[in-house]
Amino acid sequence: MAKEYSRTQRIGDQMQRELAQLIRREIKDPRVGLVTITAVDVSRDVGHAKIFMTVMGQDNAEDIAQTIKVLNAAAGFLRMQLAREMKLRSVPQLHFHYDESVVRGAHLSALIERAVAQDSQHQEGPASPDAKPESTEE
């Protein structure tokens, strides 16, 4: 049985694809780096859309904030371009947000790797796992 997607999910998926291409092709501002649109969350009334994005090579919070500011300033232009590409009665207002899930995921992976390394060090300690316990019987 095929998965059922709501209308807002379908609109969000199409907006994600279109915005990725539009930003790459149309936004020539040097403050905007390599932007990846990770998700688009469209409201039920299709009036607003939260666009979650990451920027490759920009770990500095100021650079990321500047990129978001530029994209939010260009939201009207991007919305107009989306209206040309998509067959919608009204195109939602665009609100760009930084997607911190990628950074959080990398941090959690580092914590897990550190915990596994510490665990393996404790197991390799004074007693090896292959050693048999000594018998007290004579």
Curated annotation (Swiss-Prot):
InterPro entries: KH_dom-like_a/b, RbfA, RbfA_dom_sf, Ribosome-bd_factorA_CS
Provenance organism: Pseudomonas syringae pv. tomato (strain ATCC BAA-871 / DC3000)
UniProt entry keywords in alphabetical sequence: Cytoplasm, Ribosome biogenesis
Subunit structure comment from the entry: Monomer. Binds 30S ribosomal subunits, but not 50S ribosomal subunits or 70S ribosomes.
Database matches in SUPFAM superfamilies: Ribosome-binding factor A, RbfA (SSF89919)
Keyword Transmembrane: no
Domain of life: Bacteria
Protein name as catalogued: Ribosome-binding factor A
Protein's GO biological process: maturation of SSU-rRNA
Gene3D superfamilies reported in the protein's UniProt record: 3.30.300.20
Keyword Transport on entry: no
